[in-house]
């Protein structure tokens, strides 16, 4: 069984390190990008099983990256968890309409992010024959 591929996209190096720390005991291939443009290129190149995406970034923000992903045949169904310091119903509604699976307010607890990632990865693997859940 191959390890799940996860892409972390955030302009804050500190936040990328926090995501990396959250996954320290989670067996996966973790890729990183510093903005939406880098993130889109990394997603196209690596075909991640899940993307942890920051909402507000320079160059290309999370919503623009998400819209571009939804127009790409290979990425349009890739699950996304959006991270943001913004606690706005308008933002949450916007990204939900774009298919974001979950929305986490920064700063986040490692266990919260990891439980959401584990749930999404396990749901994605369920249709595959006899794939054991990741822990």
Model-predicted segments: where are they?
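C-terminal output helix
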Residues: 90, 108-117
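Conserved acidic segment of CheY-like receiver
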Residues: 3-14, 19-20, 51
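Active-site beta3 strand of CheY-like receiver
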Residues: 46-52
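Short, glycine/charged-rich "phosphate-handling" switch motifs in NTP-dependent
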Residues: 101
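Receiver (REC) domain active-site loop signature in two-component systems and cognate sites
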Residues: 57
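Two-component/phosphorelay signaling modules centered on CheY-like receiver
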Residues: 13-31, 98
């Amino acid at each position: 069984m191959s390890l799940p591929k996860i892409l972390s996209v955030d302009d804050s190096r500190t936040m990328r390190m926090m995501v990396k720390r959250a996954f320290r005991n989670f067996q996966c291939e973790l890729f990183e990008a510093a903005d939406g443009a880098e993130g889109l290129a990394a997603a196209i190149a690596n075909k991640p099983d899940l993307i942890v995406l920051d909402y507000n970034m320079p160059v290309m923000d999370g919503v623009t990256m998400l819209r571009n992903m939804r127009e790409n045949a290979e990425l349009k169904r890739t699950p996304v968890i959006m991270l943001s310091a913004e606690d706005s119903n308008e933002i949450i509604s916007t990204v939900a309409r774009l298919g974001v699976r979950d929305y986490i307010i920064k700063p986040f607890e490692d266990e919260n992010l990891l439980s959401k990632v584990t749930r999404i990865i396990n749901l994605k693997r369920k249709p595959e024959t006899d794939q054991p859940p990741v822990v």
